[in-house]
From Swiss-Prot:
Residues 8-77, 294-329, 337-355, 389-399, 417-443 have a biased composition (Basic and acidic residues). It comes from Danio rerio. This is Serrate RNA effector molecule homolog. The keyword Repressor does not apply. Residues 368-383, 400-416 have a biased composition (Acidic residues). GO terms for biological process: primary miRNA processing. GO terms for cellular component: cytoplasm; nuclear body; nucleoplasm. Its main location: nucleus. It is found in: Nucleus, Nucleoplasm; Cytoplasm. The keyword Nucleotide-binding does not apply.
Amino acid sequence: MGDSDDEYDRRRRDKFRRERSDYDRSREREDRRRDDWNDRRPSAREWDRGRERRSRGEYRDYDRGRRERFSPPRHDMSPQQKRMRRDWDDHGGDPYHGGYDLGYGGGGGPSYAPPQPWGHPDMHLMQPHHGIPIQARLGNIHDMDLGPPPPVMKTFKEFLISLDDSVDETESVKRYNEYKIDFRRQQMQDFFLAHKDEEWFRSKYHPDEAGRRKAEAHSALQNRLGVYMYLMDNNWFESVSLDIERAPQITKILDAAVIKMEGGAENDLRILEQPSEEEEERERLSSGGTPSEPSKRDEPKPADTENKPSEEKDKMEEGEESAEKDGEKASAGGSEGEEKTEKEAPAEPIPEPKKLSKKRKRKHSGDSEDEASASESESDSDSDSNSHCSEKPSEREREPEEVEEKEEEEEEEGEAADGKEQTDEQTEREKEKEKKVKDDQPPRPRPLHRTCSLFMRSIAPTISKAEIVALCRRYPGFMRVCLSEPQPERRFFRRCWVTFDRGVNIKEICWNLQNIRLRDCELAPGVNRDLARRVRNVNGITQHKQVLRNDIKLAAKLIHALDDREKLWSQKPREETPTLELPAQNPILKNITDYLIEEVSAEEEELLGSAGGGDSEDGSKEGNPTEITVERDEKLVKVLDRLLFYLRIVHSIDYYNTCEYPSEDEMPNRCGIIHVRGPIPPNRITLREVSDWQKTFEEKMGPLFSVKENLSEDEAAKMGRKDPEQEVEKFVVANTQELGKDKWLCPLSGKKFKGPEFVRKHILNKHGDKIEEVKKEVVFFNNFLMDAKRPCIPEMKPPPHPGPGQGVLSPGGLPFPPQGPQGLMGFGQPRPPLMGYGGGPPYPPNQYGGGRGNYDNFRGQGGYPGKPRNSRVMRGDPRNIIEYRDLDAPDDVDFF
């Protein structure tokens, strides 16, 4: 189908449009833009076609004031290429150009990168969108209400511009330091006011809620300590070492600890001796499939049903009971919906016997009706044959027969009633016996160490934990909710785990929660998978005797620091703790110094001769480390493993992974992962490898030793620490209003007084709750201020302008612009990830108040990724740079 005449004329007019002056006709073209040609052509080939024209005039609209130099191309080397349509002029509705026309400082421009030549144009939308507004998902970033951008601290150069010329250098430095302190103080106060009503912030710094949270954490720690002492007293750690070969035994110990933490008894620990759920499923499927076949084979024929109705009923009742038991087992042991369908599959043919029984009952009743009709017909025939007899004798004969039949029926009914009474008594006796047997048997162990859980990626900071608990408590098997620490780079959104009992249908619960919103925040839950590898290994060099001794020293030091911080052994134990008597010092640290002292045979070496030892020492000093074999000391291994189990179970610290698992008591798996020693290296190791391992490991362990840092008094005063008495005085003055001469008002109660001193006395006496709130608010703010690691908005630093040589891609380098920092939109709006090659850069940093969108920044970073090196836009300066190059030379860089 050809284009219309108007379209053909327009194309003829535009044929030589490049030779016209952009400066003269730029405004006319703004009014006479092309139609949206994206609808007329396949979108999948849009960027491929545009790739050919990127080498010359793609960025012309970003500098409309300039005039380009056009010269006729040379055709002796290659034929003339067809000039493509400029379908990128109209940016309406295009997410890449949506924020281009924003004013200076208006929203920071679009966040998406320019079109990548290797990806689909819609690929930028393929990203997790949990918690991101719908405008961001549709590409209209400039329509999002992200609030005002946070202020950016001025550089010293920018600050000097605002100063008078008469200010000398020392004074300017002094004023700039004051400006920085004022800026940080104001930023901190704004952050406090913005987040002080959010649950995560109050639970961290508010005096009431922080104290409650600390008490809960301490009680949970005491519970964990009691579990560890129970396991140690019952010799659970005796025959187990933290080696990767003992992974099943290590997992069993962790599961036993979880069962005890959940309040399990001795009987519940027996479930660890039973086969796992997978083995039970196989056995259940095999046992469920075999009995179903004989039941089908042994189905009685219709002729037999008349003879054996009672036996068939008994069989049917037994089958229904077994089906119910199988269904209960399946519901108790299943974890996922797919598994449940497999488990319930053997129970599907069960309704068929019910239908058969109904048909058989109908058949029985039909047979009785046929018999009755047959007897009636027989009686009719008899009456017809005996019609010659008189009617009176027949009536006389019928009367005694009817009386006899009634008597027989009454006798049968009495016998049936007696039989029913006897059967009822028997069933009651059987039930009582079964109850006694059940009471005598121990209760079935519960799988307290296995759970099902849902994961919610983005929970808004305004949503409290109580709201999620109230929402999920409606579903059976609900246990607990865990919310992670807020992520400043993601607008302080939190991740959430909701834990349920193992016997629930977790996929059904997940489906029911799919479309539920809390305060305009989509929960978007997903089923959380079980942990794949709970026991993971590190380098086998950790089995060396020297490394083991160093690990004992570090672990003992860490245990001592954590116990002192949490005051586990210094105070008297509470009544509710499982361990009634706790010694003043941790028993596992007793005589620990005996294993930290290294024993050497120096005298023996001296007597036998120091030649060999001297040579080895000289060799090590010269930088030629000697190779040694890994020596394992079982005594050191046993002592170290006891310490590492203590760290993992009590303090939730994975020693070999050098990390702490926060909020583990609220997570679905309370003792999920542990890292252990790997197999012994097959080759010999060097002393340098041992020393390097110890050095790097100690550096990684450093953050675990660090105590909570607080600001000094001087720094706190500079940052604006508040005094409770002064704040109370300000509160009283603010609530003392003068209405007129000798008329003063207390706005809190509406009462009037003759003087301000009476209002003050009234507030202090009658509004003590308000005064306490003011004091708590002061403590709240000071707690936040004194935290040296307090949360804050991520500081946005402008990227450094590239030098003249940084914009040009070298032939030997990567065909990508330099790596830019992962910037944020608005208040921590997450940046979409790059959907291209793995080695490519992220999208360019989006600055607050970014002028004409984000393209000027990107031009300063080397143009589009994969753009040929003859591009003219690899600079940050908007002015043209005159360059001299051979126009006939082919492009020497072809990335695709």
